[in-house]
């Protein structure tokens, strides 16, 4: 039991050490958090608002369900 606990603690420590000392030239976590903060302040900057969707009566994709307001039925947005 003690050995198992020691192994778990060692793995967690090494994982944390790897993430803390990783060389990321793009500042991955810093960019991630600053972009998320920017999107909270400016909802127009969110990538979700820029999705392409089809209006009612246009041809649509059954798999993606890419209609803006309704559903894709028989390849036409309703």
Curated annotation (Swiss-Prot):
Location (main, coarse): secreted
Compartment annotation: Secreted
Signal sequence range: 1-22
Modified residues (Methionine sulfoxide): 59
Classification via Pfam families: Conotoxin
Any one GO cellular component localisation term in the record: extracellular region
Molecular function via GO: sodium channel inhibitor activity; toxin activity
Tissue-by-tissue expression: Expressed by the venom duct.
Domain of life: Eukaryota
Disulfide bonds, paired cysteine numbers: 53-68, 60-72, 67-77
Propeptide cleavage-removed residue intervals: 23-49
Entry keywords, A to Z: Cleavage on pair of basic residues, Disulfide bond, Ion channel impairing toxin, Knottin, Neurotoxin, Oxidation, Secreted, Signal, Toxin, Voltage-gated sodium channel impairing toxin
Record bears the keyword Signal: yes
Similarity-based family: Belongs to the conotoxin O1 superfamily.
Function: Delta-conotoxins bind to site 6 of voltage-gated sodium channels (Nav) and inhibit the inactivation process. Binding of this toxin is strongly calcium-dependent but not voltage-dependent. The binding site is most likely on the extracellular side of the sodium channel. Binds receptor sites on both mollusk and rat central nervous system, but despite its high affinity binding to rat sodium channel, it has no functional effect in vivo and in vitro on it. Also has no effect on Gambusia fish. Is important in mollusk for the paralysis of the prey.
Further comment: Veratridine increases the rate of dissociation in a dose-dependent manner.
Entry note about domains: The presence of a 'disulfide through disulfide knot' structurally defines this protein as a knottin.
Name the UniProt record assigns to this protein: Delta-conotoxin TxVIA
